[in-house]
Amino acid sequence: MTSTSQLFDPYAEALMAIAREQGLEDRFGEDAALFRSTLAASADLRHLLENPTLFSSQKKAVLNQVFGSSVHPLVLNFLNLLVDRNRIAFLDGIADRYQALLRKLRNVVRADVSSAVPLTEAQVQVITEKVKQLTGAAGVEIESQVDADLLGGVIIKVGSQVLDASLRGQLKRISISLAA
């Protein structure tokens, strides 16, 4: 059985190689972000691209219409290649993997932050600096979401590391220590 990374990695790495040759790593990263946000926002587009009964020419026409004026021409060629190879359904995963490669190249980490209330800009800055200190990264991409169940504080995930500074986590730790 083939893992998804075995499907995504060669295409993401090929796109990165083209980007590096042309000095367009960040531009292609922006295009990858556009794919991901567009696919997340449009179930119809996802279903259309995944539809095996549509001809490649139809899928290419849709991709050209949706992304043609927004993405770099080399990226549009890449999308057409994915259609030709019947891999366009994996676009989201390939784009995600490309962004991970770009973060690695730029020494940037992604931090998933859950908080009880929306974070202020000042709080985001504090978290960013703390994550930089902990990881030694040059930059941090913060993905935040609100989780009212936390009661207060934050949970920060960077890779496999989790820093639980939430009120819920503190109460759980107190409960465990009292039960012991």
Swiss-Prot record:
Keywords from the UniProt entry: ATP synthesis, CF(1), Hydrogen ion transport, Ion transport, Membrane, Thylakoid, Transport
Keyword Membrane among UniProt keywords: yes
Annotated Gene3D superfamilies: N-terminal domain of the delta subunit of the F1F0-ATP synthase
Database matches in Pfam families: OSCP
Subcellular location: Cellular thylakoid membrane
GO cellular component: plasma membrane-derived thylakoid membrane; proton-transporting ATP synthase complex
Keyword match Lipid metabolism: no
GO molecular function, one term: proton-transporting ATP synthase activity, rotational mechanism
Main subcellular location: membrane
Membrane topology label: Peripheral membrane protein
PANTHER family: ATP SYNTHASE DELTA CHAIN
Family: Belongs to the ATPase delta chain family.
Function: F(1)F(0) ATP synthase produces ATP from ADP in the presence of a proton or sodium gradient. F-type ATPases consist of two structural domains, F(1) containing the extramembraneous catalytic core and F(0) containing the membrane proton channel, linked together by a central stalk and a peripheral stalk. During catalysis, ATP synthesis in the catalytic domain of F(1) is coupled via a rotary mechanism of the central stalk subunits to proton translocation.
Assembly with partners or alone: F-type ATPases have 2 components, F(1) - the catalytic core - and F(0) - the membrane proton channel. F(1) has five subunits: alpha(3), beta(3), gamma(1), delta(1), epsilon(1). CF(0) has four main subunits: a(1), b(1), b'(1) and c(10-14). The alpha and beta chains form an alternating ring which encloses part of the gamma chain. F(1) is attached to F(0) by a central stalk formed by the gamma and epsilon chains, while a peripheral stalk is formed by the delta, b and b' chains.
HAMAP family: ATP_synth_delta_bact
Protein name (record): ATP synthase subunit delta
Species of provenance: Synechococcus elongatus (strain ATCC 33912 / PCC 7942 / FACHB-805)
